[in-house]
């Protein structure tokens, strides 16, 4: 391809105006390399946070290793539950998690079909499964008899992570009406 003299002049002026050799401009390459390094660091942090979250659900939660919850949760964790209430602190969060295992001792999370994050945030979809095989305490010394029905709930967790690699805030989402229906207590 042969360029006309005016096209060559235009191309030369564009190159000169963006060239590292132009006196009044700075090369964008170092800035781009810095941005790339920041992006790669952020991606590594996100991957590490998601790996920590996988361990949380697949091992710590599923096997009720409450003494290890601090590996993924800050001591002052703020947790938002699907019904709108919150808990503050690791101890209170653990106390909120334990009752599920009383009436469904086989409760488990074994898969995260979707997981991603950006910066200090992660979003994970999990599948919570179990079977209502034991009496469910409802307060005042009363219980609901087990139905023997299994449940399989899709849930989502949005987590805010600190630089220390633990969540300081967690948003939990699942459909309580669907859960009650699956275990035979809803319509």
Labelled PLM ranges:
Residues 1-8:
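Bacterial N-terminal signal peptides that target proteins for export
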